[in-house]
Amino acid sequence: MSEVETPTAASPTFPVETSHRLDTLHTSSTEQIIKDSENVVHTTLKLPTSTLSREFWMKDERTNNCSLCETEFTLFRRKHHCRICGKIICKYCLKEAPGFIFRLQGSIKVCRPCASILVNNYSRSQLFNHSLNESKNRDLTEQHPFVTLDELNSNDQVLSSFGDLSSTFEMPNNIHPPEVAPMIAIPSSRSNYDSPGWAHHSIFLDWSKRNLDSNVINVEDSESGKYNALTITNSYDAGPSSVSTDYRPVNFGKVPSYSKLRKNKAFSSAKVSDMYLSADERNRLEDFSKGDRGLSFVNLSPNIKATSYDRLSTVINEPFISRSSSLTDERGLADSGNSYHHFSDSDDESLFNDGLGLSFHANSAIIKQRQQNVASIQRYGNESYLSNFLKAFLPKTVCDYLFPSSTIPDGLPALIENFNARVDKVNHPGGTEEPLPYQGKSRASSVVTSSKSTCILPPWILFSDSFNQLVCTFLGKLLFQMLNDEGVDSPMQWVLCLPKILLKMALDLGPDIRSGDDIDVRSYVKIKKIPGGSIQDCFLVNGVLFSKKASSKSMDRSLRRPRIALLTFSLDYACDEQRILSLDLIISQQEEYIINLVNRICMLKPNLVFAQGQIPSIALKYFEEHGVIAFHGLKESVLYDIARCCRADIISSIDKLSLCPRLGTCGRFQLRTYVVDENKGLRKTFAILDRCSERLGCTIVLRGADYNQLSKVKKIVELVVLIAYHIKLECALLRDKFVNMPELFETTYQSLSRKSLPSFASTAADKEKSQNHEKKSLNSDNQSLRPLENENQSVSSTQGSNSPLELINNLPASDDYSSITKALKTRFLTFSPFLSKPLPRLLNQVNYYQFIRNKLLKDVKLHPYSPTGSFVMKQSENDNVEESYEESYKFFCIDERYHFLEKQWTLYYSHSKLMFSPFSSQRIILLYSIINKETSVPCIGPERCLLEFYRETDCTLGQYIEDSCLNTNVSCGGEYCKTNDMLWHYRSYVHGNSRISVFLESFSCPVPGLEEKIIMWSYCKFCKKNTHITVMSEETWKYSFGKYLEFMFYNSQIRDRFEFCDHSVMAQHVHYFGYCNMALRFQRDLIEIFELFVPSVTLRNNPSYIKELKEKEYKRLKGVIEKCLSSVASRINQIKCDWVTDPEKFESCTSEISKFRTLLSSDYTELYSEFDSIYLNSSTSDYLSLNSILRVLQGKMVKWEQRFLDYQRLYLPSYKELSKIAAAQIKKVFLERPLSQTPLDLPETLENTQIDIYPSFKTESTDDQLEKVTQTNVASNKRVAPYADSMANVGSPESDCFSVATSSDIPKANIDFTNDISTQNTFPASPVSNSGFSRQTYPNISQRQGVNMLSHKRKSASTSDRRFVNASSTSGMNMPISSSISAKISSIQNSTKYSPRKPIPAKDVRVSSLVRRFEELSLQLQEKQKRDEELIKARRKRALPVVPSKPVVEVFNDLNEAFDDENSEDENGINDTKENRATESNFSGVDSMSKERENVSSNEDNSPEAFEDIFGILFKNESGLEEQQNLEPSSQMDKEGSKLPTSGPLADKTSVYRILSAFWNEWNSLNPPPFEFPLQPTEHMFSDSNVIIREDEPSSLISFTLSSPDYLSKMVEIEDSMDEALTNQGLQGSTQFKIENLMLKPTGTHLKYQFEEGSARLSCKVFFAEQFSALRRACGCEETFVTSLARCSLWESSGGKSGSAFLKTFDKKYILKVLSRLESDSLLNFAPAYFDYISKVFFHELPTALTKIFGFYRVDIRNPTTGTICKTDIMIMENVFYDECPSRIFDLKGSMRNRHVESTGKVDEVLLDENLVELIYESPIFVSEQLKSLLHSCLWNDTLFLSKLNIMDYSLIVGIDYTKKELYVGIIDFIRTYTWDKKLESWVKEKGLVGRGPEPTIVTPKQYKNRFRKAMDCYILASQDFETGEGFKFCE
């Protein structure tokens, strides 16, 4: 991770901040200083040895002792004089200083104090820098032996280049098409979380202030006009050793190569002229470059380098210097007459511009050069060249106005006359008016209309009227608004006075930023408050004004063009105060020292001396004698202002007097006295240095109020000064962008005129007091301000009654969105009249949700809808109730989101007090990054950066472009980047909903000669065309880079003036800047801002889900009713009276059947009527009440079963009777059959006969099942048993009976039919199933199957059990039979005989062998009968009536006891037999249920003979059969069977198969299929609850337990005891207070509930019952919690790596996670702290992203009948994505090790960290700054809480919905603690014993917390919105 560098500004030249800065202003090499001093007027100091003249030495007779050590001089101790101060010292106090400082060989003698001064002023490197400079210059000269003036000017070459512009240049359409900027991405290996995010070093440039170095330039060659000629530093004149590296914004400390430096303007102007040119050439260059450019709207970039391009600029601009005075009151100014011969008497304010001591009119060299320039232009000025040249750089409107026809006047003078004539008409269309600053007050817009003048007017003048009008109107309204906000009296008078002053100031001021001036113009504008007078007395001073009394009353109070000396050293005589000295000696020495010092100063011939320290009175006396006015005790800042405005050197030490310091000057000096308090008569004197260069600085004087009022005005004016200057630069930018400026000015002015003046009103009394006076002054003021009159009246009239806003200290309420929105739309908040900021995104959202919420409340009749979604109204009350429910739910969702956003807005609003003020618009916050073009991975950032406009964190647009283009090979700063060059990277700035990408590209300048100038053009992305090329003007070069980005982000209305394009210039164009054969591309793209959702405090129920569930349940239960009653109808229809022989019974049987049909019809009507009534009268959310119909249905089915049992007993023969008949027939067959027949032929014959006789009743599924039977049979006899089963199943056709069963969607029971039902590994003997009855008929059966897999021991058995269920319904006695099969019983006997098998030789065999074979068949039938008995028992269970639950409850107060009480039982319970379980059972419901079973069983034939099989009857009385009970193995039987003789078929006898088949068919006709009951063997229902317990849905047991009456009563008891305890403590609170106390209980109650239903044992243990109940009540989900848990299904989410089993409730509201033993222990230990933390979330609004846990339970289900054994720990938590459909889901841990899965595109697929990183490479995820702050706060709080509990391995689940642009987040899996195994693994890996990966796999909780925070902060990025003063701060 790259360290973030905080930029620190280099030591600035201005302003001076420390006491040593004034000294450091002279830290330059003496050699260069002496060279520069040749052009300065020399003093009359006698310097024969270039040191202090002996005239200023102290006389030898003055002292006989050393001035420093007081050592007496002797013959051997000589006197020495300091060559700097002139004191007499001894050799021990003597130091030698390098002589080259004073341009001497060797060294000079100085005293120790002077030597220390030299050391302080000149560092060691600077003392010896002259030698380095000489060698460097020598090297440069060797590289470039000759650089002549002709080469530098190269007029012909440049002019010929411009000659190529004969036609307007247009960029080709295919040149540099704007590619789509790749989106920023997050590096997978690191993040910049530790970055402070403010003012990153790679954004900003250090151009404004730099450290001084030896390579200085002369002020005569500089554009800045700065006060110190010895210390001017240029931006590019430094070599590699002098470039500042402590503040490296773009170049990262790298220096461009010399070849590029040489191309730079400032370098070529300063260094080349000094190093390579002769004195004459330098003078010529200086004379040429001294013109005042002013504010020019031609696209000519000024340059000291004397090209013809610059000459034209000089010609265009110089003649427009007007003779105008400043706004200073001149009545108190008088000429002093102290003028010098080289100064003109002209009052021209441009007299001292640009460092010149001469007037332009007196400079013959300039005039001569100007004539040469005009001649050169005329020489090249043919008609086509001149017109096309101007067309290339002037706006089209200007060119059309200048050249109305194709005929261009010959020569420049004619063109100028035409130009001036037209301009004169523009400026004075209807007569004469008082000119505005642009109409004669400013040199930039002044017009010399003399016919003798040959000039070209700058295009700016063409719209000076509209510009002045626009700016004055905008500034006036802005001032009026801000003055009202501050409560300033008489705001309208200020509005009428200040705009003109501010406009003139902005137009005149022009800091030279290239030479080191600050880009903040406020550094050079001082605002002085002088109480008293009137507001109209405010004035502007083009110089400095400061408060200072005169040192002497006799001194002059006014001077013209004084010479000014600035001193910062002390004039006092310094002596050792700790020594005892003679007072007379000290006085004499002091006097002589001061006299000499004053004489030395006066030799410079100053008129004014300003000293920082105190001046001794004797010195003041001598100054007065010399006619010098001296001021002392000046502030350092005042000296700085004087030095800059008057261009004077600050003399910081005595030695500087020997270096010919430069004295400053001004046009006029005066002392003026003002009355500041009329009541007290207080007066104050001010010194005024006026008529200095306008470009260097000025002072605005405020008058007309008291000090407090003026302080408020000063604060406002300081900002408006910057705004006025910014508007000037912005207009230049728009002009360079080819915007139609006159049209823009007109439309903007009209918009401003229509805009009202809302303000934070003052009191009505104040307005009424000042209104009369303001109206009087309106008539005489400027017309541009008159529209403010009506607005002022309207504002004043409304402020007294219903002002839209209060005072600024009484802002509108945070929920008054309409007022806030109106104020933000109507108030002036930006620096520009062309720009309006959008409303804060958060305000738009909360306003929108409030509107929708109110609309729903008004237009929709809502149902009562609690936060949990419990609908109270019944469905029968409203026809459109479903639609109303949906509207209610929609309202709840909107209301919930509205309140959430409202809280965020309130917090945001509280930190945004300056939202309604322009003071909030002084900065912009960006998300900044440097991104690799190829990989899209950011090398720097993304990080939040602050840009303060026109401050040190900002730079100019020109600086940014030049530095970027000159530093293409600079490293990007990325730690892992392989291509470090910035040419392969781009910068990205994200703000609001946009992103600006800045690309650096290679580019060949299309116009030769413009490579060294910044050219501009743009490309429309929609029109696919380029605009014309233009050269960047100087004003555009100074435009703020931060404001340029803001302009691109916010402006979308301004269009260019080209006909082919009507799109927004700033928003929809790609902007190009070319410089040095490089192009910088600015491209704006829109980004998607996602809405962020954290887990809500309250849960909700979507009525559509509830409605869907209820509808499904209604249809399912209706099908159950239909199926059960259909089974009764089928039984009734199959009843026959054929076996009834008694006529009396026959009639009663017929009447009984008729009665059955009547009762069935009555049951149909009753059940459906009751069911529909339950459905209609229950609430929409209550679908469990529908289960109550099952209890009614179950009772009716029990009655029907009893009726048919009675019917069978009365009218039908028993099984025993039928068996006797069949046995008699079989005996007859065997007695008549010959013994030669092989017994083994019987099964084969039966099998073959089955296939032949019943082909139509064999389905494919039946064949498959039969095949499975032969493969999986586990009976002892592996050959005979299949035959027996086949014979038993032959007569079981399936066509009619399953026509009803196929409509069922209820699964069959999991029944084990083996002998030992307690054994798990059991297999069915005959698993024949019906193909029509499949699991597919029940939609959720597959999900419920998965639940059984929760128990690892039941995984294999569960699958087999399901096969048992289907087999049980289709085998043996329970197989239904159709009437067609019954009809065939008689026909079977008469069917054709079977074909005989191939004859086998007959053998003798005994009758006993034959009997043994039949006995084997009998054994198989007995086994089948046992299985049928088991099924009958299961069926009997279903026939039992529903009884109360009667649970056994155990209460635990000790957590460990509650958690471990079942360990011993768990170990042994699985192997218990059914009998042991029944013996150990202590359930109270056992006796009652046993009695019920006995009652039911008593009605059946349960005697030993009741089920005696046919073979028992057949061989019952035969003797000798007992000996055959021990069967032989099948292999042995095969051997014996092979010996049996075979014979032919029995043609005469009836086969045994026919007899048996007829027997089974008859029996099945007498015993039709069993009834269908509403409950399955795996379903359990009790009479005291509507919840059905399902063995494959563990949540149903939890739901049943929580809804049991006993549990509810215990919760009431706990709450009552809590209330009683609080009452005893004297604490009474609301319901929330009680809930909070329940959650904070130190101990919890743990309950264990045990139920028994039939053979099933059900147990549920509830942990922390009252705490979780209170938590659910706080969330508002307690009422619906039971309903949601009633049904669940297996939830399989692919992609995740947790390996845990999950269940999801049918309503998708809750997730159930199956916990391991270790996780359960962690959860129970973690629970108390969790309740404490979550209570702060509910009741103290603590931000959190933790998903809520609603309960922890242990479920134990054991049912031997179905083979179910399920014991598991279940944690119930909320579903983060409830009612949402995220497109992608991510499980994020902040690690990149093994955090990648292959995406399959499945629903609910969970992806990991690396998948997210791959995604955000292409499409980063942005949220608003406020929501990102919320997420940051949530993650900070949650991770801190979890780390304190030693918890780790938690994840942030993130769902992204690209359709709705929403982001859902929540922390899950936060129950894993840092256990000893993790610690050991971490220690081993830290020691390097195993694993050598890039990052540790096991970390501590603290490390995990930090890594998690950093990663999440990097995954989700924030886009800063509307910045309001203080901004939105992180809530950490």
Swiss-Prot record:
Which CDD domains does the protein's record reference?
Fab1_TCP, PIPKc_PIKfyve
Which parts of this chain are annotated as the region CCR domain?
910-1231
A Gene Ontology term for the protein's cellular component: PAS complex
Q: Quick one: where's region CCT domain?
A: 457-721
> What is the main EC category here?
transferase
Region labeled Disordered — which residues? Answer: 763-804, 1346-1371, 1457-1504, 1522-1544
Among InterPro entries, the record links this protein to: Cpn60/GroEL/TCP-1, GroEL-like_apical_dom_sf, PIKfyve_PIPKc, PInositol-4-P-4/5-kinase_C_sf, PInositol-4-P-4/5-kinase_core, PInositol-4-P-5-kinase_N, TCP-1-like_intermed_sf, Znf_FYVE
The alphabetized list of GO BP terms reads: phosphatidylinositol phosphate biosynthetic process; vacuole organization
Keywords, alphabetical: ATP-binding, Cytoplasm, Kinase, Metal-binding, Nucleotide-binding, Transferase, Zinc, Zinc-finger
Enumerate the SMART domains for this protein: FYVE (SM00064), PIPKc (SM00330)
The UniProt annotation places Zn(2+) 1 binding at 66, 69, 90, 93
Q: Where in the cell is it found?
A: Cytoplasm
Q: What is known of its domains?
A: The chaperone-containing TCP1 (CCT) domain is essential for the interaction with the scaffold protein vac14/SPBC25H2.03. The conserved cysteine-rich (CCR) domain contacts intramolecularly the C-terminus, including the kinase domain, and this interaction negatively regulates PI(3) 5-kinase activity.
* Protein name per the record: 1-phosphatidylinositol 3-phosphate 5-kinase fab1
**Source organism per UniProt:** Schizosaccharomyces pombe (strain 972 / ATCC 24843)
What are the top taxonomic ranks of the organism? Eukaryota, Fungi, Dikarya, Ascomycota, Taphrinomycotina
